[in-house]
Amino acid sequence: MKVSAVETGEISQVSAPRKGMIRGLSIMDFILRIVAAIGTLGSALSTGTTRETLPFTTQFVKFRAVFDDLPTFVFFVTSNSIVCGYLVLSLALSFFHIIRRSSAAKSRILLVFLDTVMFGLLTTGAAAAGTIVYVSHYGNVNANWFPFCGQYNHFCERISGSLIGSFIAVVIFMIIILMSAVSISKH
């Protein structure tokens, strides 16, 4: 009488590394979501609180720069805030994937879909703000847009710095989406 592979335990030895890899991917996913949430929160707060008033004024005009003077920066702050909120809410599902490895394929597919949507939102916000920051640093002579970062140094430094956190979150989203796709393929 032959002994089957299930009775000898050979199948469980083959599937054990796969489960360990999926758990490792889930833990990495959780950590990356926290880092991306911190990056988007920092970008939104840094841009949302940026304002500078020049020390000289005229009788009727006060020279100031505030982030909401440009709709692009408003969109940047809004997109970073939405993505940060999503990342905080998705931490619960990511933690669920760490605890319960089985029957999580459907929720992983949902997360990949929502991650892709948030990736697009974050990328468009960061790219639009990056364009305005570039024009404010270097100007565009053909369109008669002159650089104003020579006058508003503090404003431009904070806006430029906030782009770093947002673009780091974009890269992290790419990694999260790829890791989720690998994890789904292993199920």
From Swiss-Prot:
GO CC term, one of those recorded: plasma membrane
The keyword S-adenosyl-L-methionine is assigned to this record: no
Topology in membrane: Multi-pass membrane protein
Location relative to the cell: Cell membrane
Transmembrane segments: 25-45, 73-93, 109-129, 164-184
Quaternary data: Homodimer and heterodimers.
Protein name: CASP-like protein 2
UniProt organism field: Lotus japonicus (Lotus corniculatus var. japonicus)
